[in-house]
């Protein structure tokens, strides 16, 4: 047997084992990701079939302070639908895939214009009036920062 053939025989089982281990490490997430998202409102929005939340298909491109970002969501008309708002920290965290980084979204997600940035949530910090919660789509972690900073916001449809 050639050296190349022996190398391939060693690499293939290792690759298969790694793939299987990856799937088994996150079985609930891998199984639940199938059919998770549906395009709605003529493709302008995405329904998360796990949570029932409807998200903009393409998050806001504007970087703005917390208050104006929330106001912009409230005034939006996406796919002919009004009633948008800034998401809570808990709602925005539902989009995170803990196995992914940069961006921390599930593979095959239908969103566009996703940046591995920190996005505002509508959740203020209860201990500090000048601070609000955000979610990093690079790491998938929630963080806080001053409301005077500029970030993008990913609007969600009011239930």
Briefly describe each language-model feature range:
Residues 2-85, 89-159:
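Glycine-aromatic-enriched surface loops/turns that form tight recognition elements
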